[in-house]
Amino acid sequence: MSLLTEVETPTRNGWECSCSDSSDPLVIAASIIGILHFILWILDRLFFKCIYRRLKYGLKRGPSTEGVPKSMREEYRQEQQNAVDVDDGHFVNIELE
């Protein structure tokens, strides 16, 4: 007699889910949390660029201009704007064959 014949295999009834029609509050809460988690994950994947860009750059402010004369504020703003502006002549056209 081999060991395989001695091992009990569960019947089909043993594998059934006991929580499929359960009204247990813990099961209901877990289901709701799982569904909400899935919805939030989908939204995160769809809008992650907007969300993380807002968190990274949207909450930061520039340096304080308190006590700085208005002319210096305007000069600083102009320097920052010039640093952001891009000259169109610096673009390179690459053509693929």
Curated annotation (Swiss-Prot):
Coiled coil: none annotated. Its main location: virion. It is a single-pass type III membrane protein. The modification Phosphoserine is found at S64. One of its GO terms (biological process) is symbiont genome entry into host cell via pore formation in plasma membrane. Residues 1-22 are virion surface. The chain crosses the membrane at residues 23-43. It is found in: Virion membrane; Host apical cell membrane. Gene3D superfamilies: 6.10.250.1640. Changing S31N: In remantadine-resistant. It comes from the Viruses. The record marks H37 as: Essential for channel activity, possibly by being protonated during channel activation, and by forming the channel gate and the selective filter. Residues 60-80 are annotated as: Disordered. Cytoplasmic tail plays an important role in virion assembly and morphogenesis. Belongs to the influenza viruses matrix protein M2 family. This is Matrix protein 2. The gene is M.
